[in-house]
Amino acid sequence: MQSARMTPSVGRQLLRLGARSSRSAALQGQPRPTSAQRLYASEATQAVLEKPETLSSDASTREKPARAESKSFAVGMFKGQLTTDQVFPYPSVLNEGQTQFLKELVGPVARFFEEVNDPAKNDSLEKVEEDTLQGLKELGAFGLQVPSELGGLGLSNTQYARLAEIVGMHDLGVSVTLGAHQSIGFKGILLYGTKAQKEKYLPRVASGQALAAFCLTEPSSGSDVASIRSSAVPSPCGKYYTLNGSKIWISNGGLADIFTVFAKTPIKDAATGAVKEKITAFVVERSFGGVTHGLPEKKMGIKASNTSEVYFDGVKVPAENVLGEVGDGFKVAVNILNNGRFGMAATLAGTMKAIIAKAVDHATNRTQFGDKIHNFGVIQEKLARMAILQYVTESMAYMLSANMDQGFKDFQIEAAISKIFGSEAAWKVTDECIQIMGGMGFMKEPGVERVLRDIRIFRIFEGTNDILRLFVALQGCMDKGKELTGLGNALKNPLGNVGLLIGEASKQLRRRTGIGSGLSLSGIVHPELSRSGELAVQALEQFATVVEAKLMKHKKGIVNEQFLLQRLADGAIDLYAMVVVLSRASRSLSEGYPTAQHEKMLCDSWCIEAATRIRENMASLQSNPQQQELFRNFRSISKAMVENGGLVTSNPLRV
């Protein structure tokens, strides 16, 4: 499970990461996406990078079709815009029939994991028991979003998220097995499959008769997908391709019968006659012959899931098994990987829910110094912070699933944020649970140490969080950069763009005089949350001011300012989280939910601290010379360590 390798040009490459994720929001031939929980084959580590897309001054002079204004809150916040279409009010997307169907599923699935599945045994055996797999098949768990007419349950993204949450509460090893199968294993068939491909393969995978796996990562390719070496050469007759190569760290690799495989294919340019290699996606069956696998990998966590190397030796793949178009494999891979990021947040929200229950139980029953430890301030703060992190993660997960079900097309930044936030929140919550439980938490019997081992991979799955932070910042800056390019073009023709220039001048004047942007969430958030709403608006203004200043300073060079980009991404994550919880808590207050006042406290607490972080971080980036000194020190210290082969300092005893 390799971490992404960072190269000097990674910033420019990242401008493509996720650019197509939103366009896969609806599955072909069925209602909206199957963004099945991303539970999550190791090969997703790659964050899938494409050839660089640069911000070219020439590009701004070419005629381009008008693009609809994005409804994404995340896109808007980089521009200093308060775009509320996708975040307010907190969406309710299930109709009565869907809600009833979900209720009928939740009970049996929860009981199965409580009464039948044994996560400790799965971990010890390093596999999911056959009886458990059979039970999951009977529940329909292998085809949750496959259309019902093809043997699946045909769930929406929101319905899927709820079941992903239940699985995450109980066993992340099983989650990975299920997710590697349907979230990425056969997801490409759902997104890009022809009618014939769907009819041939989906009934088999939906029933669990055949497991699926996603084969992308190779020893030479981590984040740089273009460096894969597996090849698929078309036969002279054009009826098949001969596939050769190997893939590493493939979840379900030793169990699967159907594989989504990515390989380079030679493609002749019709105009020039030149032959270039481009990535193409294929549906490959083990029964084709020439498909073998290695021994299961020994891993830190998610031991119950099968992870192995897969080899393809002269495999004859029928031409009709090309997935999507020849040469479009990168697009297929990006959409598969990006399509289900929200599912990780839903899964880990469930994991946190279960872990928090263990922490609360221990704090409630443990007596020290003559009192229950839940009465001690240190423990109270830990529990409260754990609850806040779970609330934010869960709110993001269901916001995103609803956005997808509603048919919104632009949510890739939000999806990346949910993955980053959820995976880091789950790690913190589990770590704090162990701390609250003390020595008992470190023991094997309570099962928290297993969850900690399992959770560590989620900061690597789906693209490492480091890579995704760069994507969040660069994608947002790219959208803002286009706006600034438009302003520059307007200055070339001031008489024809009076309105645009007056608006920009007015905005700059308000910022300089401290008047503010005039943005407000008044009338949008519940009145009881007005103070937190004001904090969110102020944070947005501070964030957007720094984004614009840094873009003006660095221009295209911002792609190489990774210290800066990381901190902008952290601000974006905090800000999106503020708005999401404001939306959810507002709905709870408006509807009079029994938990409304508790949710208000969770929301206010998050907003107070997030606003403080944004204010301090943005002020530091904007005007603190010590920040630049710190960045220079990081570069120099790191360089010295690399040159020295490790630490530069010696033991203080000099012995």
From Swiss-Prot:
Bias kind Polar residues: ranges: 21-37
Single biological process term from Gene Ontology: negative regulation of fatty acid oxidation
Tissues/organs with expression: Widely expressed (at protein level).
Topology term for the membrane: Peripheral membrane protein
Active-site residues from the entry: 462 (proton acceptor)
Post-translational modification: S-nitrosylation at Cys-237 in liver improves catalytic efficiency.
Keyword field contains Transit peptide: yes
Cofactor list: FAD
The enzyme's E.C. designation: 1.3.8.9
Biased composition range(s): Basic and acidic residues: 60-70
Catalytic activity field: a very-long-chain 2,3-saturated fatty acyl-CoA + oxidized [electron-transfer flavoprotein] + H(+) = a very-long-chain (2E)-enoyl-CoA + reduced [electron-transfer flavoprotein]; dodecanoyl-CoA + oxidized [electron-transfer flavoprotein] + H(+) = (2E)-dodecenoyl-CoA + reduced [electron-transfer flavoprotein]; tetradecanoyl-CoA + oxidized [electron-transfer flavoprotein] + H(+) = (2E)-tetradecenoyl-CoA + reduced [electron-transfer flavoprotein]; oxidized [electron-transfer flavoprotein] + hexadecanoyl-CoA + H(+) = (2E)-hexadecenoyl-CoA + reduced [electron-transfer flavoprotein]
Record-listed FAD binding positions: 214-223, 249-251, 464-466, 562
Residues recorded as bearing Phosphoserine in the entry: 517, 522
Pfam families: ACAD9-ACADV_C (PF21343), Acyl-CoA_dh_1 (PF00441), Acyl-CoA_dh_M (PF02770), Acyl-CoA_dh_N (PF02771)
Binding annotation for substrate: 461-463
Enzyme class: oxidoreductase
Modified residues (N6-succinyllysine): 71, 127, 195, 239, 268, 276, 278, 331, 372, 482, 556, 639
Subunit structure: Homodimer. Homodimerizes after import into the mitochondrion.
Entry function: Very long-chain specific acyl-CoA dehydrogenase is one of the acyl-CoA dehydrogenases that catalyze the first step of mitochondrial fatty acid beta-oxidation, an aerobic process breaking down fatty acids into acetyl-CoA and allowing the production of energy from fats.
PANTHER family in alphabetical order: ACYL-COA DEHYDROGENASE (PTHR43884), VERY LONG-CHAIN SPECIFIC ACYL-COA DEHYDROGENASE, MITOCHONDRIAL (PTHR43884:SF11)
Family note: Belongs to the acyl-CoA dehydrogenase family.
Protein name: Very long-chain specific acyl-CoA dehydrogenase, mitochondrial
Organism: Rattus norvegicus
Top-level taxonomy: Eukaryota, Metazoa, Chordata, Craniata, Vertebrata
